[in-house]
């Protein structure tokens, strides 16, 4: 998630906003501690691209609606955005759809990262197949310690500037909001009620995975948001809590 590996000034410039000191939104990169996979295993995964380059991840909510992170859509116009779906590779294959419009959560705050969620409407509808499928939104949070998976084309380590061509995934375990904010971990009061965490030793999402899916029990439970470094000890990855933000996603998808 947002990792501490790029100069803060560069990130602020790229994203057009500010973030807490040491807590950086994930830019281009790769899953840490994970494995290569294929899109058929994560058919809801998309690559959100700016001017043809991978920028963030996202999840297919319906044939023409994508769920991603609000910080992925700061200071950008829909005209330079596109989505690649149905491909294991962010740079080729599958189908490419232009972005018609998008909306960030009105309560999104780039300083605290609360409400870090957004909805994208595509210019054309996706045709569902074995490699393009929608994923349901969680209606409640999984139990602390529940198994989950996060996927994306994010960096393999903190500070890496290389982007893998093939989709990566990693298995992690849910860390509840209360547990993530406890003294067990290092975030404290930075964990808010619109966030959920996930962690596993030496495993995490990293720059470039932002906006992508955290899936548990076959439903979307989180949207990759931020964190301290990539797979740093005592700092789980932090995600927008889909169960908490579900009603906003549903209403926005119907109105955007």
From Swiss-Prot:
SUPFAM superfamilies per record: Trypsin-like serine proteases
GO biological process, one term: proteolysis
Residue span(s) of the pro-peptide: 23-30
The protein, known as: Trypsin alpha
UniProt keyword annotations, A-Z: Disulfide bond, Hydrolase, Protease, Secreted, Serine protease, Signal, Zymogen
GO function term, MF aspect, one: serine-type endopeptidase activity
Species annotation: Drosophila melanogaster
GO cellular component, one term: extracellular region
Lineage, uppermost ranks: Eukaryota, Metazoa, Ecdysozoa, Arthropoda, Hexapoda
Enzyme Commission (EC) number: 3.4.21.4
Tissue: Synthesized in the midgut of both larvae and adults, primarily in the ventriculus and gastric caeca.
């Amino acid at each position: 998630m947002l990792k501490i590996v790029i100069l803060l000034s560069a990130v602020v410039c790229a994203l057009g906003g500010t973030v807490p000191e040491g807590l950086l939104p994930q830019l281009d990169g790769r899953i840490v501690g994970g494995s290569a996979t294929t899109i058929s295993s994560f058919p809801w995964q998309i690559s959100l691209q700016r001017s043809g380059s991978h920028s963030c991840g996202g999840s297919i909510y319906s044939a023409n609606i994508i769920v991603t992170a609000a910080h992925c859509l700061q200071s950008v116009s829909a005209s330079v955005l596109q989505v690649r779906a149905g491909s294991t590779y962010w740079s080729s294959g599958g189908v490419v759809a232009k972005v018609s419009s998008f909306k960030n959560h009105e309560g999104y705050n780039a300083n605290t990262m609360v409400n870090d969620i957004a909805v994208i409407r595509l210019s054309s509808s996706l045709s569902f197949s074995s490699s393009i499928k929608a994923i349901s939104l969680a209606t409640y949070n999984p139990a602390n310690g529940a198994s989950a998976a996060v996927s994306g084309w994010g960096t393999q380590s903190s500070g890496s500037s290389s982007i893998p061509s093939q989709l990566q995934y990693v298995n992690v375990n849910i860390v509840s909001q209360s547990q993530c904010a406890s003294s067990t971990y290092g975030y404290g009061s930075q964990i808010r009620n619109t966030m959920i965490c996930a962690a596993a030793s030496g495993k995490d999402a990293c720059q470039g995975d932002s906006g992508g899916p955290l899936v548990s029990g076959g439903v979307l439970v989180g949207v990759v948001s931020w964190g301290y470094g990539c797979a740093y000890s005592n700092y789980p990855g932090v995600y927008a809590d889909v169960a908490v933000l579900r009603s906003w996603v549903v209403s926005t998808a119907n109105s955007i």
